[in-house]
Amino acid sequence: MPKRLDINTILVIGSGPIVIGQAAEFDYSGTQACQSLREEGYKVILVNSNPATIMTDTATADKVYIEPLTLEFVSRIIRKERPDALLPTLGGQTGLNMAVELAKSGILEECGVEILGTKLSAIEQAEDRDLFRTLMQELNEPIPSSTIIHTLEEAHEFVKEIGYPVIVRPAFTMGGTGGGICNNEEELIEIVSGGLKHSPVTQCLLEKSIAGCKEIEYEVMRDSNDNAIVVCNMENIDPVGVHTGDSIVVAPSQTLSDREYQMLRNTSLRIIRALGIEGGCNVQLALDPHSFQYYVIEVNPRVSRSSALASKATGYPIAKLAAKIAVGLTLDEIINPVTQKTYACFEPALDYVVSKIPRWPFDKFESANRTLGTQMKATGEVMSIGRNLEQSLLKAIRSLELGVYHLELDHLKELDKETMKKRIIKADDERLFVVAEAIRQGVTKEEINEWCEMDFFFLQKVENIVNMEREVKANVGNMEVLQAAKEMGFSDHYIANAWNKTEREIYDMRKESNMTPVYKMVDTCAAEFESATPYYYSTYGDENESIVTDRKSVVVLGSGPIRIGQGVEFDYATVHSVWAIKEAGYEAIIVNNNPETVSTDFSISDKLYFEPLTIEDVMHIIDLEKPEGVIVQFGGQTAINLAAKLEAHGVKILGTSLEDLDRAEDRDKFEAALTKLGIPQPVGKTATTVEQAVAIADKIGYPVLVRPSYVLGGRAMEIVYRQEELLHYMKNAVKVHADHPVLIDRYMVGKEIEVDAISDGENVFIPGIMEHIERAGVHSGDSIGVYPPQSLSEKLKEQIIEHTIGLGKGLNIVGLLNIQFVVFKDEVYVIEVNPRASRTVPFLSKITGVPMANIATKVILGQNLVEQGYGTGYHPEEKEVYVKAPVFSFAKLRSVDTTLGPEMKSTGEVMGKDLTLEKALYKGLVASGINIPTHGSVIITVADKDKEEALEIAKRFHEIGYNLLATAGTAQSLTEQNIPVQVVNKIDSEDYNLLDIIRQGKAQFVINTLTKGKQPARDGFRIRRESVENGVACLTSLDTTRAILRVLESMTFSAHSMKEITQTKRHEVVHA
């Protein structure tokens, strides 16, 4: 069936900010879909609130709206643009829920907008747990015995009948939000109450736990002609009970017999047909390992995290084809873009093994509960490809960037059998490492299988790795053993440690005897047809399929998995850099390992190597390709950290030199450079011992800011108010020694300013200056940023511009630089300089129209700023106001403190733009998920140091009609100032207290600032967590609170009696 000609304009809904459960995979699928629809000649209108993505680039769609994804704003866009159709299945759960909300509000009918791809009825049938259960019963498809509940009482009834454990799955949520496994009544009450709150329709499915079955996923496609195919099937190494986003996944499935494979394949196709889905769909199934009994777990009637993985694992571009199917094309009419010969109705075949390992944020959140269950906790993932499972797994492990190069963790070596058993039974992020350790210590596969039901096949693979370790250690210097270990995916790093050599020595040994990897192509058809994709993975074998051309090439290093501190912003910069390299006439080669991102789409670069970002894996590619050089500026800290090792191998680093990179990162060299340039900075020193640290802090005076050098996202950074806190930090947070010094700075309570600039060594061009709403001390990634700055005098702005130009030239920067300043007592101080792309590059590029990563790449390749039409100085400011607001994923991470400080905690960002700061802030806050009611109650509990400042805030809340609630101490200071306040009991009171008010939804805002040390810190923690669990906006910074007040004041009308007005005027005359 040819494409539809009765529609012209299509609205695509994006997935909004990156949160746990919904990451960069939707930037990839959304970008693909927009391009795909435009190829077919449709006009595409995109709405998405996330400025950090390629998807929201003006070139991606005909019109791009970066607006909040709420009914109010999307309805406005529909009324203004009048699209013929809406495509919601590429924006994750956000896009689906938005479509349902739009349909229910009547706006689609009013404006005559049709939903494309998957019909509303199919979305509801798949997402509404009750309707889905009914459909499965009609199809005679087995599902675990279950019931639908809307109250806690109903949950208790079900459990009486069926017994524990039960699984709770809230309707219309993603990433398992609010769900979990309940083993007893206490867990049931907690999880069901939370689940009902998180579900937009207050509905949960309770089902008998089938934990322990194999978890299998099928990624299927169907068109309007009822052609349906399986793109890829995947198997979770972790049995049912761990969310698939938190599971280690392999593709294709490894332990299914042909009969089992065909049985589950037929079920998946039957379900997609029954739902009438046109496009991509993901079916999750559970298979009993001891019989042919299976259960249908759930269906995602949309492009998902698994489809991004399946696309990269097979090379078959699901989102691109789903968009074409949505406009009426059929699988037998669409050419597969990979082979460019076969049609899309051929099922892909794989002649390699793919492994996906999630990347969790526990290195940032020491206190988080690391146990894995049905609620997702990972922020991102890595993927790797190998010729055997062992190779594939070991490559994935070293892609995670946790400083781990092998399936072993030193701190697990001390574990006794009982502890290992506990950690294997109750899965956490290190379970596979614990399994390997258990096998090393002689625990049998049978015992481990009994503990966690992990399939013997996978346990055998882990045992193969452990046996090979013994071989390697027993045969030092033996080249045959080395060859065998390399074929199994062992790293030079591991072998060097085992053989007591350096990694470089092993690398040289291999090179001398020609023991180097070859590169194989990912072609969707297991080499059955010739293929046109330049998409490669390494393995040890005979024939190399990556043909080196005679064109000059440049290698760009990507940024690896998405994690807190290094998000999709760096992928954005990477992609733009690749495009600029192509424009400049070079061959662009990219190395990356994140299956979710646009940069790992094979159509972006001239060559894509899906490989770990370690020195060994990158050097193999460089040895083969012999590029002009490598660009490390766009891959975040991942790429920067490889610069020194690459240079030691004689590789040319393009852009800012290694020496100059080091000058910006090394504290003493940086101080010397600033002194020479005459640029002021907060007083600070470097300590290499604990005693030194104490002496420095005493001399500078508290509070001080302490942090390790060379760090991204503010890991292990703290503001310390007294000596015992400093000692606690030095002993627990960092291991200080000469190679890892700790920086100690005077902490200045001032306004923070952030600048991104491009330097070519002669000229320095500044696209924009941003002002942070939160004062210095809150990480820049967690602050609300405003452009253009609203409260900087011209004098200060000139100083900032002057210092930026001075630093660009003085540090010999070639390419991008990001500088953070603090304004303290009307003086500008430099806090830090990052000689690389920063997380504000996409935001500033979009609002100023200056393609920063593109210009910087061309500067790096030798075309100066003047030749590109830019000079030195500050780009003229835009008239509108733009706000970048952070988005957090605290609801997914129980027991993590939500307080903002120098350590970054946000997972994503949104943008709000409008003519005034208040309107832009309103949009930014609403887009980030903060509800802003114009009246209600606000709870105020603040640290003593903030009491005075909180008075003015309380007064303003009172004036716009808010009801104030406070605990005794804070209430007393308010009453003394004649501010009406209601006293509430502290949380340790037996009576109705502060937490009850939060739980019952009787407060709209909670203002709680941190009291350091002592008991109040724990109280504050409980107040903040309770707010998150109950969806109440909890403000831990008085600056953020002021910003929200500005918005509220602009939305509400004040009410003053006439007498008050005349008194005010008289008062002004007296003071004039």
Curated annotation (Swiss-Prot):
Residues 1-401 are annotated as: Carboxyphosphate synthetic domain. Mg(2+) 4 binds at E832, N834. Keywords: Amino-acid biosynthesis, Arginine biosynthesis, ATP-binding, Ligase, Magnesium, Manganese, Metal-binding, Nucleotide-binding, Pyrimidine biosynthesis, Repeat. Residues 930-1072 are annotated as: Allosteric domain. ATP 1 binds at R129, R169, G175, G176, K208, I210, E215, G241, V242, H243, Q284, E298. One of its GO terms (molecular function) is carbamoyl-phosphate synthase (ammonia) activity. Mn(2+) 1 binds at Q284, E298. Mn(2+) 3 binds at Q820, E832. Pathway: Amino-acid biosynthesis; L-arginine biosynthesis; carbamoyl phosphate from bicarbonate: step 1/1; Pyrimidine metabolism; UMP biosynthesis via de novo pathway; (S)-dihydroorotate from bicarbonate: step 1/3. This is Carbamoyl phosphate synthase large chain. The gene is carB.
